[in-house]
């Protein structure tokens, strides 16, 4: 790992440059319908607007202390840090996620807010110190980036009833938040816990049919979002940009529906991607790794529900007639070409 002092010592000082507004602030990589990463161009204005839109729900001020434990190369934690900075809150940065260290840091630094993916929350709940750890300073936990198992959410609410929970739904193309489910909604319980919440103050959300018409309440369609936080487009991908960005609306590739009270429910993903432990796994990459095995004739990779990771990578494999390959063989074959979290957990 690199530290700030090393970077400063070994690199020349950059020439000061004034940038802002609609100029590009950064390129954040994400997956899409093709299964290949795409660079999402976000402007300074979009990132600022997203942070402002999150402030009412995050409820931070200058006394707040925000913990960065989720990977900071993801837009989610980047946006959380923006909201903290706009609130004049303190940013507490951890080098990596370790449950023991997280509990120690929360207690020592009097952390008040944190963004955690559901897999992190489950690891914390399963830790031997979960029941005795000092979480008294914590005010809110924001979660998202992958499906939250109902059992994990119930355990979290039971163990830490004083902590307000906020679910954030969105994607990198939205810098990244589109809707939020409030702490009050969590405490109400029931069916609402399956919802992704309501739109933030800065954006509009619709559910549309294939012809672009608004779907009726309770009828599913594609979720589309419009606001000052939407992307500029995909880096060097004009065709993909045209498909995803229409008249200012970002077509998310997610299927959802609204209830009569304006709460959004995500019912499926249209995009060819599995989200496991908050990380995106492109199924085509896993399929390509498996199909290169000499015994494999055909393969399809899907995501299946998983209590710890939200989703797990599952491979359906057809072997050539007369060939044989065990699950261990296929796992070892994948390990040579793709990251560990992308390897199928089951076959």
Indicate where each model-derived feature is located.
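Conserved AMP-binding A3 loop
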Residues: 25-49
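Conserved ATP/PPi-binding loop(s) of AMP-dependent carboxylate-activating enzymes
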Residues: 198-202, 210-243, 279-281
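AMP-binding/adenylate-forming catalytic core of the ANL superfamily
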Residues: 106, 114, 227, 232-233, ...
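Conserved pre-ATP/AMP-binding loop-to-beta segment of ANL
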Residues: 11-29, 36, 59-65, 201, ...
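Structural core segment of the AMP-binding/adenylate-forming
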Residues: 1-10, 17-18, 321-323
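Conserved S/T- and glycine-rich ATP-binding loop of Class I adenylate-forming
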Residues: 24, 30-33, 66, 72, ...
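Gly/Ser/Thr-rich phosphate-binding loop
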Residues: 86, 111-116, 125-191, 204
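Conserved AMP-binding/adenylation subdomain of ANL enzymes
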Residues: 48-65, 73-113, 127
């Amino acid at each position: 790992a690199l530290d700030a002092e090393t970077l400063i010592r070994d690199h020349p000082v950059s020439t000061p440059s004034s940038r802002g507004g609609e100029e590009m602030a950064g390129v954040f990589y994400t997956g899409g319908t093709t299964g290949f990463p795409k660079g999402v161009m976000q402007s300074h204005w979009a990132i600022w607007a997203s942070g402002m839109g999150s402030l009412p729900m995050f409820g931070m001020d200058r006394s707040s202390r925000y913990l960065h434990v989720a990977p900071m190369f993801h837009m989610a934690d980047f946006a959380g840090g923006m909201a903290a900075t706009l609130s004049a809150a303190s940013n507490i940065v951890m080098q990596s996620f370790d449950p023991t260290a997280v509990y120690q840091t929360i207690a020592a630094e009097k952390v008040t807010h944190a963004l955690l993916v559901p897999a992190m929350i489950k690891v914390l709940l399963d830790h031997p110190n979960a029941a005795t750890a000092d979480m008294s300073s914590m005010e809110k936990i924001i979660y998202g980036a992958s499906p939250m198992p109902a059992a994990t959410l119930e355990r979290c609410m039971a163990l830490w009833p004083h902590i307000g929970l906020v679910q954030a739904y969105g994607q990198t193309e939205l810098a990244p938040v589109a809707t939020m489910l409030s702490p009050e909604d969590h405490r109400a319980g029931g069916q609402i816990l399956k919802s992704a919440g309501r739109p933030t103050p800065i954006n509009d959300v619709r559910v549309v049919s294939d012809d672009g018409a608004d779907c009726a309440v309770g009828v599913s369609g594609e979720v589309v979002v419009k606001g000052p936080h939407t992307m500029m487009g995909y880096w060097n991908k004009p065709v993909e940009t045209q498909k995803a960005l229409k008249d200012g609306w970002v077509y998310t590739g997610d299927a959802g529906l609204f209830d009569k009270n304006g709460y959004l429910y995500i019912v499926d993903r249209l995009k060819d991607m599995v989200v496991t432990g908050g990380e995106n796994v492109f199924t085509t990459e896993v399929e390509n790794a498996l199909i290169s095995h000499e015994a494999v004739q055909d393969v399809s990779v899907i995501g299946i529900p998983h209590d710890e990771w939200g989703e797990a990578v599952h491979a359906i494999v057809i072997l050539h007639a007369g060939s044989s390959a065990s699950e261990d063989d296929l796992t070892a074959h994948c390990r040579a070409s793709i990251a560990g979290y992308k390897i199928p957990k089951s076959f």
